[in-house]
């Protein structure tokens, strides 16, 4: 869980920007989207294989 402390004389927008950056770095949002629905192991393997193939192509 990402957590930030709002600094003295820091605007809410700046604090929100820092929070969003920390969430992105931690991968929290991406992980939540990935776990939103159950994915069968066979589908997971297929997606992983296609991603590797795509990376290799580039």
Swiss-Prot record:
**Superkingdom, according to UniProt?**
Bacteria
Alphabetized InterPro entries for the sequence: Ribosomal_bS21 (IPR001911), Ribosomal_bS21_CS (IPR018278), Ribosomal_bS21_sf (IPR038380)
UniProt GO MF annotations: structural constituent of ribosome
Q: Where is the composition biased (Basic and acidic residues)?
A: 31-42
What biological processes does GO assign it?
translation
Which keywords label this protein?
Ribonucleoprotein, Ribosomal protein
Q: Where is this region: Disordered?
A: 24-58
Provide the leader sequence positions: none
Q: In what ranges is there compositional bias, type Basic residues?
A: 43-58
User: What's in the GO CC field?
Assistant: ribonucleoprotein complex; ribosome
Family according to the record? Belongs to the bacterial ribosomal protein bS21 family.
Q: Which HAMAP family match?
A: Ribosomal_bS21
Read off the NCBIfam families from this record: S21p
How is this protein named in the record? Small ribosomal subunit protein bS21
Q: Which gene encodes it?
A: rpsU
């Amino acid at each position: 869980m990402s957590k930030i402390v709002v600094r003295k004389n820091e605007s809410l927008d700046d604090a929100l920007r820092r929070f969003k950056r920390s969430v992105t770095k931690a991968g929290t949002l991406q992980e939540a989207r990935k776990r939103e629905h159950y994915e069968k192991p066979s589908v997971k393997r297929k997606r992983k294989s296609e991603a590797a193939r795509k990376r290799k192509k580039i």
